[in-house]
């Protein structure tokens, strides 16, 4: 059915209600036929069925279509998958009287059967979505932003709290050493060795180097 498009206050035209998925499919097919080798589709929630429904419609017309999917930190993964687990339990006829679907993020549910089932769904999400929706590559946008913010929050709480410097040593440096993380020798990772080689090349024994036998990085083996 043809409709006269209505212009929004922003100056853009509103899509006809209910056509959003159809438009995604059309755009994906057109992009592939124009030379694209991978698709990027955003979804409202990380739901394997929803992703697969869209991609499989694209593959009906372009059977080799492959998808890049953003495992986005914008999703509340815990809440979304607890809701999915809750709905699955209801569909299976299980007793869900111990849970309030509107409050599934509550810490009181963290070690429950539902929470464990939800975590298992998260654990297999990439494999499930790759199998069902032909996802070629999963990525996480902004993982370093969130991990840095979390770790600095934890470090600040400990460092300015009762643990003092132990907060850094126990949770950062010792972990780097035990796990063989190269960045524990941050001098080398920042290029000080290269700088020393450069100085030595031009100044020989007169070079004032950052490294050498007394370099603190030699404390790490």
List PLM regions with ranges.
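Active-site-adjacent beta->alpha loops and helix N-cap segments on the catalytic face
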Residues: 1, 21, 45-62, 77-81, ...
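N-terminal small/glycine-rich loop or linker at the start of catalytic domains
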Residues: 1-19, 73-75, 89-100
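Structural preference for beta-strand elements that scaffold enzyme active sites
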Residues: 7-11, 37-40, 64-68, 136-137
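Short, acidic/polar
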Residues: 19-30, 118-128
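Catalytic domains of carbohydrate-active enzymes, especially glycoside hydrolases
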Residues: 27-40
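Acidic (Asp/Glu)-rich catalytic clusters
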Residues: 32-33, 59-62, 130-131
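Catalytic beta/alpha-barrel core
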Residues: 39-52, 70-71, 91, 113-115, ...
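Extended, intrinsically disordered, low-complexity segments
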Residues: 89-112, 118-221
